[in-house]
């Protein structure tokens, strides 16, 4: 028996188990211990350890504790019999061992918790008890054979039988018995449970080991030292069991509960059975039956006290038993038993609470492992023990055989019963009384069996157990797909889930084919986990080890089913996991959901890439790098859905989201394949959507509702086929999408409406785009409907609001059910609002935001593979950023949303770009669509004519119809507005729908949509559609409004009110009101504001676009505009959205009265064309500014979220900022570099593009991201020269540079500038000389460029300093501004207060410095951080109070003030400030700098540049004041963006104004990017303007 001391050695293992177990219970106790303690304790100590455990139990630990108990036990026995009260138990507990005593208390406390979780507790306990019983059986045999514990198990059969009835009857009795009732009987009951283990100890301790064991068991139950004796072995098992239990609990808490019950119930029969089992166990301890019986009462008292205090003695008994089971193994580690007793006990209670999970896994193990016969289990058990993962499965099975011998056959069979009471009924066959115990017995026995090699269990049990396990464990927690992302938690959680899902198949199969499981476990390093866990190890391993074995993949694939990998897993599983056909099939079943999402194509593709996809799916699932890898081939337009769906599935859980957050951040970091990235983005989005659980769910509803709409929309769009990737538009496509929606869980369904409604766009995208992206984007768009792609991103946050609103509204809007969609949008927005409020309000929000953002953005990033921008955009848009994506999508929708299809095409074009750099996705969403739309759409829209109609809208918008709708038909917005927009609106809304009109249809959708669609889609679409759009404001806003340029303002307003699309920003009160009005604004605004907005939006943007740079405005502006509006619309929406729900936002809103009561002003200003468009943005921004405190935190959170996927967020900002650039932003970051070269050399290109509107258009499409960023910037500067061109292009250029680098965000954003020195150069390319003040860039770069590049700052600063250039621009821009000012002046004036840029333009013409200064402190102080918003607010403020000076001042000073601090100082200022997020946005977006430091850039090209450029800008600023000053400092970013003063000013206002102004649009893009984008990114950038952006981006 000294081996028992050795057992103590095992104790180390057990101890590990114990701590692990402790840890395990915390989350998934089973997970960690399974690998570590379980493996060591169980596999190594499988037979010996058990023996050791048993011996240690009996001898070392047990004798001492036992002696204590023994000494006490006689009295306790006498007393205990009498004293069922906890006192007896407690004294024993305390007397036995202080540690256990405390544990007893702990246990009791936990038990109380457990009692609360009693059903689960019962399962858990029973499981544990069963395990313990199994161990007892094992130990009885083991005890006889210290070495051949398992082989000795045969003696266990009698005890097994006894235990069986013992468990059975008492199990039922315990289950039925009230805690107190059970307390009295269960004093014994508890004893029996322990006697179960006692038999183990009894054989170990011949003298009174029974009693000692009983006390040990009692102590264990009670937390007494005696427990350690059972605890040691049991704990080993328990560690194993705990891990298994964890898995089991995940899969089937019932089993454990039953097990606990079964184990507990034995109390009534314990003495007789104990005696009987004792003799059996007693082989050595046959004499101890009585001792055991005696033991029983004392132990029972212990248990009773535990149980009684525990509320449910049963639960407690079960718990103690469970603990004992758990601790039994650990008790093999004598010291550990006690330690374990304490921890174990605590864990056990935890298990009661958390062991549900543990117990479930335990159950799983118990159930699962039952399969193998005891004897078989013996060798296998040893193996399994070595291979802990398998151990449970096999061991249990082995245990079954032994149990059969022991007579726990019933138990083995009963395990299923724990799974279902039916098993208990089934148990009766073995014994009428034992049936419940049989049910529970099998659980414990299998559990113990794995430890003790419970071969005694009959194989019959094994089979049943196996089936039961499969049943109970497998399907239970499929949602754990989440866990996939969560590698650690995910391990247990996902494993359990996978096990649950796959466990049935796999479990069954594994039971049959344990070897593969074993392998898989070894591969998965989760060797510790038994097969049910085995699958988990595979998944875990696969997650952890990127390249899990294919074999593992089969089992591990189950996760994949959750993800796209699921489908791949289906194929791969089928291909690879042929052996595990069932598992595979199950996965396929699981894939059924995804598969619909997938087209058959996806499956085919996956089938083709079974191996690749298996791996890739795994990777995809994990990093979605695989998505990037795999999607190329696999990812057909239909595939992205599947990929996204997989993430959607994953996003089913926030865990996934969380994991995605860091996993995507990490694994997907770069968002390399637009595919994988888009994919990830979608998944993340979906996750994010799931993150917004309510949102997703509502979306689901919409999905259902939208489908009809979608069907129409789809049909309407004429991309029905693609939309429902499977040709069936509504039926197939929808179902697919719907399924995916389902998969998305909540998101997809809603997305489906959006997807379908939006799906028309999505499908359109998918179909029209037909490109990998289209599906992705379409699915991000259409799937935006799914909110996974877009809706997930935009509609996630926005999907709830805008996306669904926009997507639904758009899709529905076009589908003809805008109202319903609007409802949904509102609902969604409400959800979104609520969610965001939660995010903002709760620290959770940090995680959520981070996750959402991270997931969203990283996902965006990964979704955007190369460019998370759109995904990020989508993601940001998704939740708060949803606004951005909205913006992005809106820019996209404006550019793309306006041509949702266009956006889709943009996406699609961006798909290339997007795949190249999903920024296109953001762009696609926000900017790429515009850019991509312009450029990609131009490029791709051709590819996707329908979207082209839409996507081409921007591009085609040269066919202003769709394109203007994209930006409200910017100039055409008027005609395009009314005319093109209806078409465009349809297309746009549709496209927008597709694009989501992203901002349009997303949270902003209503807002931006309203602004955009309503602005210009609504006028035309709003006019025709917008009314409905108005009615369905979100639809209008999103669909129709989205089209409107005015809606962009509306969107801004909406954004500011954030709702407008959902009114959910209503909290914004004013803005909500205004935004709600934005809804109205979109609606109201659609009519009035719409007109206003049309004027503002259309005029602002269109005017600016049309007037300022009709041509470039049409295209480049559209892109800029879209991004502007998109960015701003989105961002404000995001910012405002969040702000809206944030009281601070309201507070700030008041503070930002200057912002025109962002909401009020937004809406009002929206209403007033002046305030309307520009102010909507200003409001939005201002609102953001206002809400900056709240928004700052919100945005900060969001930005952090984005920050989490900083690059993505930034990227999407990039995207938004430079739609095309945005596209390049991520994947194209190189492209950006390329374009950066362009940007650098874009002077040339920009000159051409900037000079020529066509060039600009080239830039506009910004294929030339450089073209846009460079071209935009350069063009802007050149356009500064060209006035109109410079006007637009500079912005795009900065946008491009800004957002080009945006992938870097900090870097890319600036890298676009900085990294893209070209940006500084190119951004300043047109004005590299102009931007010569690149030195300022250094300081400027210090802001956002600091990390990325002084150059960018320089470039930006250059732009700011560019004031010379900016002046040039201003000079040019004034002309440029003049067209814009024409409409900008009118528009700007119209929304001059709102449109600081307008005022900026006009006011810019005024002494911006004064304004700047005037507003600067205020702006800075008030909006300091909210510079963007402040700029917007100040834009508003400056517009309102000073107009330009106010604006400029804050901008200028803000720049110096914010900027000088540099990114950090500036970030802190705005960071600290309400504008911090915004400023960070501005800052974080170089555009932020530009915007924030539009004046900043100009004045604070450097902090000194602040003044110097400010001066420079001022002198030039005054002349160029409107453009240069504003652009210079008003929009240094814009200036930097080469946005020319106006763009610069517009940049800041652009957020509001530039973003609204076509002229500023150039800026607007950057400004928007800088402003709204910056605003949004600002927080992201703000946290790490450079770092995060740069880092995240990179």
From Swiss-Prot:
Gene null: resulting phenotype: Lethality; mice do not survive past birth. Mutant mice show developmental patterning defects affecting craniofacial structure, abdominal wall closure and epidermal stratification.
Residues found modified as N6-acetyllysine: 79
Q: Would the keyword Phosphoprotein be found if you checked this record's keyword annotation?
A: yes
Biased composition, Acidic residues: where in the chain? 228-240
- Is the S-adenosyl-L-methionine keyword given for this protein? no
Give me the segments passing through the membrane. none
Q: Which residues carry this modification: Phosphoserine?
A: 267, 593, 825, 842, 892, 1060, 1180, 1315, 1317, 1392, 1396, 1498, 1540
Cystine pairs annotated here are none
Annotated InterPro entries: AHDC1, DUF4683
Main location per the UniProt record: nucleus
Write out the biased-composition intervals (Basic and acidic residues).
Answer: 178-193
Q: Where in the cell is it found?
A: Nucleus; Chromosome
The ranges of region (Disordered) come to: 19-111, 149-241, 256-307, 367-464, 578-604, 714-789, 942-967, 1152-1191, 1245-1306, 1495-1525
Q: Which UniProt keywords apply?
A: Acetylation, Activator, Chromosome, Developmental protein, Differentiation, DNA-binding, Isopeptide bond, Methylation, Nucleus, Phosphoprotein, Repeat, Transcription, Transcription regulation, Ubl conjugation
Its name, as the record gives it, is Transcription factor Gibbin
Q: Which organism is it from?
A: Mus musculus (Mouse)
Gene this chain is encoded by: Ahdc1
